[in-house]
Amino acid sequence: MIALIQRVTQAKVDVDGKTIGAIDKGLLVLLGVEREDDSFKMEKLANKVMSYRVFSDENGKMNLNVSQAGGALLVVSQFTLAADTGRGLRPSFSGAGTPDQAKVLYEEFVAFCRAKGMPTQTGEFAADMQVSLVNDGPVTFNLQV
């Protein structure tokens, strides 16, 4: 399971010209599901995302997680993160989770974060989304479990 996280000052997701999810300070989480992923990996990754210290403390060091920084999550499904780009000029998605598997794990990820008290907004699974963000830093990390 893969989470590409970006520290943002604002981010939003639009579908059909309508904003369906938006946050101010926080993390934009692009979430990719691979074939071997399961609920155990989902929980491990969700905990890592929520605990990862990418926000600056009073000394300018990255010592605060999203909750400690008073931020929120915007979680967007992105199956292309599971692409194999090692050969040729076209990505292969043979390692990506099936749409049914990915939807279940995406929804579990969001529910898990919310159950832990994390303010969490979402995109729309499998929709054509327009994602806008202001990357703060820029700070971007690729987390995998």
Curated annotation (Swiss-Prot):
Origin organism lineage: Bacteria, Pseudomonadati, Pseudomonadota, Gammaproteobacteria, Alteromonadales
Protein name per its UniProtKB record: D-aminoacyl-tRNA deacylase
UniProt KW Nucleotide-binding keyword: no
Function text: An aminoacyl-tRNA editing enzyme that deacylates mischarged D-aminoacyl-tRNAs. Also deacylates mischarged glycyl-tRNA(Ala), protecting cells against glycine mischarging by AlaRS. Acts via tRNA-based rather than protein-based catalysis; rejects L-amino acids rather than detecting D-amino acids in the active site. By recycling D-aminoacyl-tRNA to D-amino acids and free tRNA molecules, this enzyme counteracts the toxicity associated with the formation of D-aminoacyl-tRNA entities in vivo and helps enforce protein L-homochirality.
Keywords from the UniProt entry: Cytoplasm, Hydrolase, RNA-binding, tRNA-binding
One biological process term in Gene Ontology: D-amino acid catabolic process
InterPro entries in alphabetical order: Daa-tRNA_deacyls_DTD, DTD-like_sf
EC number(s) on file: 3.1.1.96
Gene name of this polypeptide: dtd
A Gene Ontology term for the protein's cellular component: cytoplasm
CDD domains xrefs: Dtyr_deacylase
Entry's Gene Ontology molecular function annotations: D-tyrosyl-tRNA(Tyr) deacylase activity; Gly-tRNA(Ala) deacylase activity; Ser(Gly)-tRNA(Ala) hydrolase activity; tRNA binding
Similarity-based family: Belongs to the DTD family.
Record organism: Shewanella sediminis (strain HAW-EB3)
Domain of life: Bacteria
Subunit structure comment from the entry: Homodimer.
